Amino acid sequence: MRSSQKSPVRRDSFLDVVRAVAIVAVVGQHWIMPVLGYQDAHLATGNALATPGWWVVTWLSQVMPLVFFAGGAANLLSLRRAPTARDWLGGRVQRLLLPVLPLMAVWLAVPPLLRGFGVPEQPVEVAGTIAAQLLWFLAVYLPTVLLTPLLAEAHRRWGLAVPVVLTGAAVLVDIARFSDIPLVGYANALFVWLAVHQLGFHYAEGRLGRLGRGAAVGVAAAGFGSTALLVAFGPYPASMIGMPGAPVSNMSPPTALLVSLAVGQVGLLLAVRPALNRLATTPVAGAALRWLGPRFMSIYLWHMPALVCVAGVAVLGLGYATPEPGTLRWLAMIPLWVAAAAAVLGRLLRLFGRFESMPLSSSARPAPVWRSACAGLLGATGLLGLAAGGFSTPEGGTLADSPVPWVALVLAAFLLARRVEAEQTGGRVVQHGTEERPAEPVVGRPAGDRSQLPGVGVRDVREVGAQHHPVGDPRQ
């Protein structure tokens, strides 16, 4: 399957800003919302957004719909520029898995070390869970990437009907889920996010970008209005994130409500798109976008371990307890808490951020499609196991109860996705283990190009160096 090739690369500032807004919102929410206390060897955890009336904040702070929207746009654009779907898939799968390897290596060692220093078992389990829980995104995004070439063809043929059908499937799943078949709800981990990902295709083609401000405001009103009606008269909770003790969550598993939320959020951002594009051209914002560009995936993966470090020292070591959310003391502590977490994250990025921009071999070709597909599915399975079980082995557990089997799956997936070593001879490429094929140039990319996808895009190496994003290649 050969992807169509496009004209020269140009930046889409809107997608850059959407990605930046998303990662800042994710990190800010995860750092600010925990309510922590420690007593009698037990770490108590709560959520500030569980405060009555604060659910409305989650309608804007739950930005995973924006991550999948931006990923859809970036994936379609980069797929069309790739020489073949094989080239595109091989690079994407390998690039998504590579930054996870150091996280797994570190967190296989951290729980035993904490126990060795005398940290009680329950806080160790909480730390291992928190460090791994966000891997759910990659467990869903990998299959999304694998399906992108097929979804791109479906988009070419049927256009808007594709996200409509996916949304309809999500609604049917919700009906079954709320009719005492709860496990079927996990099918929406694909239907919901694929529907939102597909909306990004329509932005990439220019349809959504051509909307005027009035039309975009109408889209936002329709999305948020539908969300409000479904919350008021349907089975859905008002909060767009999971709350401790809540019987139903809109996120685990995702509900069809997130599609209407995505429509509202995308419409809102499209309404201010000209202002966002102007903002991106200012020196400060431009510098921030360039700094964030090659670090999106690393920030996503390591911001929760940074929180674990700060909480371990402050809460377990110094006896700090989160003030009551909404009070002046709570507000006063936020800058100090965020600054401490940011300092730790900065150090972690210096240590492990290099894996996100590590170049792929320029003397080898991408793995065959079947290998990339198997690698993606294996990797998604391993990441899902880690997200569900965490990095800590239960007390008295066996090897089968530990994270080791899931880590092994992810490592095997990465090795399977590695590029096929090749020997260049007289314009022919001999691939070890595959058929002989003519060498093909990578159109629009210099030799040794390191561009990748993670939520998550890549900057043109000719513009700002090898910039890497967790939600696809934003180049247009």
List each language-model region with its residue ranges.
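A composition/secondary-structure signal for short, hydrophobic, low-basic-content segments
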Residues: 26, 299, 427-428, 448, ...
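Intrinsically disordered, low-complexity segments
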Residues: 1-2, 449
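Hydrophobic alpha-helical signal/anchor motif
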Residues: 429-430, 442-443, 456-464, 471
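Compositionally biased, low-complexity intrinsically disordered regions
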Residues: 424-425, 437-438, 451-459, 466
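Alpha-helical transmembrane segments and their immediate juxtamembrane cytosolic regions
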Residues: 2-428
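N-terminal leader/targeting segments
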Residues: 303, 445-446
